[in-house]
Every structure is written in C-alpha cells, then in structure tokens.
C-alpha cells in the first residue's frame, strides 16, 4: 500500500485530502502546529523517518491580507517550507505534489482559463511568495508537480449558506 504524507492536514484543504485518502492508502500527517515551529533540519529528519512514497503539500498561509501584514510568516510558509519539503522528497525519493495558487497570475485576459504560458505577475505578497516557492521547488526538484489552485471553499461546517446544487 502506498504511503502518502499530507502536510497541513489540520487545515482546510489538507483535512479534506486526509478524509478522502484515508482507508485507501496508508496516510500520515504531521502533528498540528509542527510546521509553524519546525526547523529545516527537524522537518527533513521527520520526513526521512516517515519515508513516504508521496508527499502532498497543501500547507500554507493563504490569507492574502494576513500575508500583506506579516510578510516574514508568509515567506516562511509559502517559500521556505515548500523548499524544505522538496528537499525531503528529493532525499527520500518521494513524489511531491505541492499546492500553489492562481494568485501568481495578474488577472484573466479574456474568457480563457490560464495555462502554462499565461503571464505571471502576482499583485500581492501572497502571490509573489507562492511564485517564488514554485520556482525554488522546481529548481530543486524539477519532477515535482505544482497545482495552481483557485479559491477553495466548502459549504458545510464553515458557516456559508447552502444555496443548492444545480444538476449538469
């Protein structure tokens, strides 16, 4: 059975990933708060000890306003931690899927969705840090997969009104 390690499993995206994969794979996560306090050496040691086949890295500081007011925390979470996770993946031979953001783009130039050739021009600290994180991860681990996700939301459990689903 494949061993998958999920970072940020207590967060919005990570908790849903953990829920979906549990029971189908051997899934582990890091303790809550571990990434906020860890050093590069401690993170590398922990991930080498876990020795996963796959690392899913959705952990981030994603509140755009918070990142503007706390750029040092944003840099650590969105640039350094992904780089450290990529180093652990490189050392252990794990596959890496790291989450980035559509905030690396400047805006929609028409009705087409973004692709790999779209202009990158982040307009805020969060977007700049996510782009720098992407570049540093791919510089170290070119085979890593980076997912530029858009705004993630869920209705249940987050106080958002349920308006119903429309069938396709």
What annotation goes with each model-predicted range?
Residues 38-77, 88-90:
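NAD(P)H-binding glycine-rich loop region in Rossmannoid oxidoreductase-like domains
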Residues 2-22:
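N-terminal Rossmann NAD(P)H-binding glycine-rich loop of SDR-like oxidoreductase domains
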Residues 83-121:
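Conserved Rossmann-fold NAD(P)-dependent oxidoreductase catalytic core, especially the SDR/UDP-sugar
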Residues 69, 73-84, 120, 124, ...:
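Glycine-rich NAD(P)-binding loop of the Rossmann-fold in SDR/ketoreductase-type enzymes
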Residues 24-46:
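Adenosine-cofactor binding site in Rossmann-like domains, unifying the SAM/SAH pocket
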Residues 65-72, 107-111, 158:
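Conserved catalytic-core motifs of eukaryotic protein kinase domains, centered on the activation segment
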Residues 7, 55-59, 96-102, 147-149:
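SDR active-site strand-loop-helix element
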Residues 138-168:
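NAD(P)-dependent short-chain dehydrogenase/reductase
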């Amino acid at each position: 059975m494949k061993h998958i390690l999920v970072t940020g499993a207590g967060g919005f995206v990570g908790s849903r990933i953990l829920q979906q994969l549990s029971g189908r794979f051997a899934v582990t996560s890091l303790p809550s708060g571990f990434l906020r306090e860890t050093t590069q050496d401690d993170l590398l040691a922990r991930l080498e000890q876990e020795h996963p086949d796959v690392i899913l890295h959705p952990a981030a500081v994603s509140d755009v306003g918070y990142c503007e007011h706390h750029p040092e925390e944003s840099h650590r979470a969105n640039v350094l931690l992904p780089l450290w996770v990529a180093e652990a993946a490189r050392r252990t031979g794990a596959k890496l899927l790291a989450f980035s953001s559509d905030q690396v783009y400047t805006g929609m130039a028409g009705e087409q969705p973004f692709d790999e050739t779209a202009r990158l021009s982040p307009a805020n600290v969060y977007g700049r840090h996510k782009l720098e994180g992407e570049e540093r991860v791919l510089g170290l681990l070119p085979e890593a997969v980076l997912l530029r996700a858009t705004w993630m939301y869920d209705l249940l459990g987050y106080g958002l009104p349920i308006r119903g689903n429309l069938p396709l």
